[in-house]
Amino acid sequence: MATSQTKELPRPQLFTVMTRYIPGLVLTGVITGLALNVGDMPWFINMGLGALTLAILFGIIVGNTLYPWLQPVCSDGVVYAKQYLLRLGIILYGFRLTFQQVADVGATGMVIDLLTLSSTFILACWLGKRVFGLDQQTVMLIGAGSSICGAAAIMATEPVLKADASKVAVAVATVVIFGTLAIFVYPWLYQLNLHYQWLPFSQETFGIFAGSTIHEVAQVVAAGHAIGPDAENAAVITKMIRVMMLAPFLLLLSAYLGRSRIKTSGEKREKSAITIPWFAVIFILMAGFNSLNLLPAVWVNHLITLDTILLAMAMAALGLTTHIGSIRQAGVKPLLLALLLFIWLLVGGTGINLFVQHIALV
């Protein structure tokens, strides 16, 4: 006699995806919504604390309180946000830039940015390894955040380095501390120099100095606004050129790490040895596309808003997976490294700005 067996039908793939990823994405979305709303408050705007910084801060708070109970349900979505939404956010970051902005500042601004970026990152690597004995991941993350564009640069460098979440959080913390300090120090230095006339800085050239040396875009805007409109415009454009240098920086870093691994392991060179961060390449392409002005300004603004949301979700995910104990274990050395880099950006950045501007006038 034939017996009939009832087999359980497989769940639809869409349902499986939803149950795996949606809870974590919702959690990061809620944290992002809170960060966006709080970041729009005047006090936080004046402090230069944008949505990205607040998202990782709120993420760390939730990650070290409620998340251990939510992790079994939310972990897949959180990891997805930290990896894939981050890359998409970096790609869409290109819509904040145009090649016309580069032309507005000219060769002088580009050379200042290039010299400041390269000298700061090289100094970070030397000090971090030789003086403080820090690991390569921490050193390069702090170097990227200090020399390029703060938290966004750290997050973009993370997949190239395959860095631990705790090290990323430490690097972001240094950017927040000294970038926030810059918001108050730079306007004070401008007024001091305006009174004593120590250095030949106009409001515009001081804006270029601020844009080439302050960590975060939001911090540049806050400091420039406190100085004056000419300084703010020059600072933001100069900062955007630094942001544009993120993509070639990631490509060079990836090539360097690939060659270092070959040299260390003694293996033969293979095509797969050097990993190309394609999201960085597409980032440049998006900036080029945006330079053509093919999309209406309203669409571009929507894409920028979407980009902020995606990056904030990635930062929230990073915060959720960061343990405060791991940050404590990092000790004071990363903070001291970031402090020395901040001093270099102030002193060395002043020298670079004055030197390049002097050469341009000759």
Swiss-Prot record:
Keywords: Cell membrane, Membrane, Transmembrane, Transmembrane helix. It comes from the Bacteria. InterPro entries: UPF0324_pro, UPF0324_YeiH-like. It is a multi-pass membrane protein. The keyword Cell membrane applies. GO terms for cellular component: plasma membrane. It is found in: Cell membrane. The chain crosses the membrane at residues 21-38, 48-70, 102-124, 139-161, 168-190, 240-257, 278-300, 305-327, 334-356. The keyword Disulfide bond does not apply. Belongs to the UPF0324 family. This is UPF0324 membrane protein YPO1307/y2878/YP_1285. It comes from Yersinia pestis.
